[in-house]
């Protein structure tokens, strides 16, 4: 199905000012799953032709191929302790395979970049150490290789495309006055309208294709915008270009009331205010990076989330205009990988400046605080460690500084389960029965957001997913269709859900044989020869195992 301009709500009706609503720029971001197959690229080419036919100027921002960023991180870890050649070969093969599917010459296009990767990894293996600058250079290669393939394919389809290096277009700013690890791995950029950039990208009326995730600092060094930072890159470009809209194309058609891979009954959220989307993203919804909201909200640029595999699904619209509804919970989210820092001390009660001193320690160590809970004798904060920013050295330095002020206790492997919606405070009494699921669990921290959009509970990580499923079933699952809730994931993708519920295991396929074998026997141990052989062959392919 071809998606036309009529399939998108008019930006003016979504609160965009005239300069935005009348803009011809459209920024389209495609995630890793959306750029990893020939079928997806065929869809992208059709979408771009439609945009050009509608008189728009598309800017494409896309990620590394699916799984490549994780593979590059794995290469770094392997290089510190052993031989990463297996993973390097997987990265090479994945790019070559896509090039072949797109009828492109992969080796000619990518071998120079792959040699650079090999050389950087060889250096890491030699010194058994990886600096933040080397880490950044290696992680950036995924986007650079993927966009080379994408631009070449679109050009082969007779589309007027221009490949540009995002590092020549986005300059990061130094936070805190000095270059910290965060300034390299989770950098930020300005996003105010940029007339010079608009003029530069207008030359030739070509489709601009560039990378997400990467930028350059004022010293000319490559920096990253944090894991999942391609969303943020796209939002920066939308802000700088004063784009008519930002389109996020992913493997899901929008934001849902819970992670649909965990809760198949999760409902599509049809329309959200920027504030609600920001809260959902910050609370753990993986569809959007939390930092991508601010640039579009500042300029009142509408944001549309669509699914590359099912572009006909309207998805989620995020803007400053939403239909007012009664107070309600719109999403149940979870964030794993949290660490709690609990600070105790009788002396902190009514002590002037204690919180200032404590938070100064976090600031000086470059550690961002998430949730906060306080009492007369305790302050507990959560830190999101999932992005790898809290190294052992930084954590040790932070604890040393805090122990000069109070007693400190560290609680690792926690999850934050959050209820996100409108006017949460007013509906807490109505949630009493739903919140009974917490009676059996130890709650380390509870926090009600000052903006009244979020109620969060921090629990042990192994309990998180179970609690999300129970809360969603109690609070959201039975809600009818409305201006907020669309269809459930299982209704939108019924065949996918059915296949997911049928595990691909040998004993399901050989059920009848097993039943016959069990007939007349009290018990028996059964091994499947084919499954054992397949597993053995996988082991034999591992180069780091000396003997099997």
Model-derived features: positions:
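Nucleotide/pyrophosphate-binding catalytic subdomain
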Residues: 1-288, 293, 459-460, 485-494
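Glycine-rich beta-alpha junction loops
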Residues: 65-66, 168, 252-254, 303, ...
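Conserved dinucleotide-binding and phosphotransfer motif residues
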Residues: 54, 157, 299, 365, ...
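A conserved regulatory-domain signal marking ACT and ACT-like small-molecule sensing domains
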Residues: 312-497
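Generic N-terminal amphipathic, Lys/Arg-enriched alpha-helix
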Residues: 22-33, 343, 509-524
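A charged N-terminal "starter" segment
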Residues: 483-548
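Structural motif
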Residues: 24-26, 57-60, 96, 160-162, ...
